[in-house]
From Swiss-Prot:
Protein name in the entry: Glutamate-1-semialdehyde 2,1-aminomutase
UniProt KW keywords: Cytoplasm, Isomerase, Porphyrin biosynthesis, Pyridoxal phosphate
Cofactor(s) required for function per UniProt: pyridoxal 5'-phosphate
Family stated for the protein in its record: Belongs to the class-III pyridoxal-phosphate-dependent aminotransferase family. HemL subfamily.
Subunit structure: Homodimer.
Location in the cell: Cytoplasm
EC number(s) given by UniProt: 5.4.3.8
UniProt superkingdom: Bacteria
Gene Ontology annotations for the cellular component aspect, listed alphabetically: cytoplasm
Cross-referenced Pfam families: Aminotran_3
Length: 426
């Protein structure tokens, strides 16, 4: 038995499912999950000493690569001053200043501890600011595990929300309306049904939790127009896309201005951090200046914020996003060529430093229904073949892949060669 397998067996006796987040259990691909001992640059090393080129990147935060010296030093320096104070610190002000400079739609920002806290808080703020209760989200888009957002569509796009998890009261979930991603007509119909009841629309600008599905050109501008028409707030969830697809986020890449933005992952540099911000007048509704309550004992933790601040300073350097995009494009082109040579139907979606692989005969993948129609069994086989070749992809057909600045020509070449051999065995 491998050391990873031994650790997993022990963990299953102590931790629900043996993991602290479900996707880590490899349920989407089968087999025993890797237990990681260390990471550096573009590579992970597991508990058995095996090395892998990593395209998970801790599910997005590691845009610079693992164990980046600037982030490591920032954490070490911060630890010397203390771990947590429960009081304001200078680094919070610096971080807020940097975020407002990099993302122009954010005029005021509050730090929290996770992406889930960020989305949960923006929904509460939108409801409190507008005095409305209903929320529109999109099928296949994930916004954390807050009760009101763990909802999917019923038999039709405008069916009242049905909980996706036990423990979410139906009476609460009914305030969440689920529309089809990239389908503006379904959103207009929702607004027509509830013209003065919808507080906000929350959307992943690139849907990264149904693999990687970019918006159609008219989708995000159309959401902005519908929100303006019906007096709702537009919330762009950039927990995954923020500072990855473009320096100013997907909202800069696609030129759309939200009322509120959710951030996470990269802004922590690998530490647990989230944030939300937006129009000053909306953010002023938060306590202590307004009536909408939001708080957190560890919010703005000085060690975590120091890591995130160092990460953003590096990400903001000239040429970073051009490099991410170029390397992701090289990987995508190599994978497509290898798949074509093996006669394997494959679609590769990509935006900036994000990408997604879809085993499908369809020429495009633009919505959740397209994703569901893909060959998941073929992906499972491909995942394990790649893992055996030293390449670690997301262990789910419904999760995006992530490029980092540490992925160089050698890593991409090895990945494409491994993929060619794997495609030949599918």
């Amino acid at each position: 038995m491998s050391h990873s397998a031994s650790l997993y067996a022990e963990a299953q006796q102590l931790i629900p499912g043996g993991v602290n987040s479900p996707v880590r259990a490899f349920n989407g691909v089968g087999g025993t999950p890797l237990f990681i001992a260390s990471a550096d640059g573009a590579r992970l090393t597991d508990a058995d000493g095996n090395s892998y080129i990593d395209y998970v990147g801790s599910w997005g935060p590691m845009v610079l690569g693992h164990n980046h010296p600037a982030i490591r030093q920032a954490v070490l320096d911060a630890v010397q001053r203390g771990l947590s104070f429960g009081a304001p610190t200078e680094i919070e002000v610096k971080m807020a200043r940097l975020l407002t400079e990099l993302v122009p739609s954010i005029e005021s920002v509050r730090m929290v501890n996770s992406g889930t806290e960020a989305t949960m808080s923006t929904i509460r703020l939108a409801r409190g600011y507008t005095g409305r209760d209903r929320v529109i989200k999109f099928e296949g888009c994930y916004h954390g595990h807050a009760d009101g957002l763990l909802v999917k569509a019923g038999s039709g796009a405008l069916t009242l929300g049905q909980p996706s998890s036990p423990g979410v009261p139906a009476d609460y979930a009914k305030y969440t309306l689920t529309c089809s991603y990239n389908d503006l007509q379904s959103v207009r119909e929702a607004f027509t049904l509830y013209p003065r009841e919808i507080a906000c629309v929350i959307v992943e600008p690139v849907a990264g939790n149904m693999n990687c599905v970019p918006p159609l050109p008219e989708f995000l501008p159309g959401l902005r127009a519908l929100c303006d028409e019906f007096g709702a707030l537009l919330i762009i969830d950039e927990v995954m896309t923020g500072f990855r697809v473009e320096l100013g986020g997907a909202q800069a890449y696609y030129d759309v201005k939200p009322d509120l933005t959710c951030l996470g992952k990269i802004i922590g540099g690998g530490m647990p951090v989230g944030a939300f911000g937006g129009r000053r007048e909306v953010m002023a509704a938060l306590a202590p200046t307004g009536p909408v309550y939001q708080a957190g004992t560890l919010s703005g933790n000085p060690v975590a914020i120091a890591a995130g601040y160092a990460c953003l300073r590096e990400v903001a350097r000239p040429g970073v996003h051009q490099q991410l995009t170029q390397q992701t494009e090289r990987l995508a082109q190599g994978l497509l060529a290898a798949a074509e040579a093996a006669g394997v139907p494959l679609v590769v979606n990509r935006v900036g430093g994000m990408f997604g692989l879809f085993f499908t005969e369809s020429p495009t993948v633009t919505c959740f229904q397209d994703v569901q129609a893909c060959d998941v069994d073929r992906f499972k086989r491909f995942f394990h073949l790649m893992l055996a070749a030293g390449v670690y992809l997301a262990p789910s057909a419904f999760e995006a892949g992530f490029m980092s600045l540490a992925h160089g020509d050698a890593e991409i070449r090895h990945t494409v060669e491994a993929a060619a051999q794997s495609f030949a065995q599918l």
